[in-house]
From Swiss-Prot:
Coiled coil: none annotated. Keywords: Cell cycle, Cell division, DNA-binding. It comes from Oceanobacillus iheyensis (strain DSM 14371 / CIP 107618 / JCM 11309 / KCTC 3954 / HTE831). Belongs to the WhiA family. One of its GO terms (biological process) is regulation of sporulation. This is Probable cell division protein WhiA. It comes from the Bacteria. Residues 275-309 bind DNA. Pfam families: HTH_WhiA (PF02650), LAGLIDADG_WhiA (PF14527), WhiA_N (PF10298). The lineage of its organism: Bacteria, Bacillati, Bacillota, Bacilli, Bacillales. Disulfide bonds: none annotated. GO terms for molecular function: DNA binding.
């Protein structure tokens, strides 16, 4: 089961007050519903590939309206051939749509979120819950970048949904797609807040656990990479120093170096693997600091560079 499916399974088990049930149902019908108009009047199909969501829609309608409801199952013919669940209404459809504020004046479809679902905080959260059940998806936080989105067919509804999300400070963004619009979030903290708002608390804790592990792993990787880079830099410097000392020894001899540089050059050749700090402690004339060793080795490098360029070393 995908992470998004786990969230939706949890959401379909939440019990709410009547006002919140209608807010959730309004989002589900608006986003997943298809209205047909004939001489007999309206008919409504609310379609989903998730059995738990289909049962949720069926129950919300039966609990709040005295309307005959059918629950149909069809086999999807393309691709994975998943089941498609259809909640079908043939009676009192206009009454339902008008009470949910999805149509006005019999035939005018309302594309935005009704103000009656924005008056109470519980209803706003329930509308968002219904919107995620209808069109929400989320990347697996264990294997992908953080991303949660809600798909909408209509731009007006996507814009009002974005506005509702951002009333909670979620920094939701809107993007046009080929066949609709998505409202999405990529910040882990905002996704966590959204899961809390819609009541997906189990999913929230799982998401936070995954996030903590990922952050720790990333911190360790950055630390290892930093230490590896420093080690490579140290090894590279030591290799260069040794090569320069050997060049001086082959060409003009180490005795051409000042005494202090001779001493550190011989120690560098003798103890190739030790750190600058350890090298400084080996100086027989008296231990010197790491920066002191580094200064002398730089002087040796400069001496070697003069030889490479054919310059006078006197």
């Amino acid at each position: 089961m995908s992470f998004a499916s786990e969230i939706k399974k949890e959401l379909t088990a939440i019990e709410t007050e009547e006002c919140c049930q209608l807010a959730e149902l309004a989002a589900l019908v608006r986003m997943n519903g298809a209205i047909s108009i004939s001489r007999q009047g309206y008919s409504l199909d609310v379609q989903t590939e998730n059995a738990a969501i289909a049962r949720r829609i069926y129950t919300l309608i039966k609990d709040n309206y005295s309307i005959a409801v059918e629950l149909l199952v069809r086999k999807k013919m393309k691709l994975k051939k998943n089941n498609v669940y259809i909640v079908r209404l043939k009676e009192e459809v206009q009454l339902l749509l008008e009470e949910l504020d999805l149509i006005i004046n019999q035939y005018t479809i309302v594309r935005t979120i009704s103000n009656k679902y924005l008056e109470k905080d519980c209803c706003k959260k329930s509308y968002l819950r219904g919107a995620f059940l209808a069109g929400g998806s989320m990347n697996n936080p264990e294997t992908s970048s953080y991303h949660l989105e809600i798909f909408n067919y209509y731009e007006e509804h996507a814009e009002s949904l974005q506005k509702l999300l951002n009333s909670y400070g979620l920094h939701a963004r809107l993007l046009a797609r080929k066949n609709g619009f998505i409202v999405y979030m990529k910040e882990a903290e905002k996704i966590t807040e959204f899961l809390s708002i819609i009541g997906a608390h189990k999913a929230l804790f799982k998401f936070e656990d995954v996030r903590i592990v990922r952050d720790m792993r990333n911190s360790v990787n950055r630390l290892v990479n930093c230490e590896t880079a420093n080690l490579n830099k140290t090894i590279g410097a030591a290799f260069r120093q040794i090569e320069n000392i050997k060049l001086i020894e082959r060409t003009v001899g180490l005795d051409q170096l000042p005494d202090k540089l001779q001493e550190i050059a011989k120690l560098r050749i003798q103890y190739e693997d030790v750190s600058l700090k350890e090298l400084g402690e080996l100086v027989t004339s008296g231990a010197i600091s790491k920066s002191g060793v580094n200064h002398r080795l730089k002087k040796i490098d400069e001496f070697a560079e003069k030889i490479k360029r054919g310059e006078s070393i006197t």
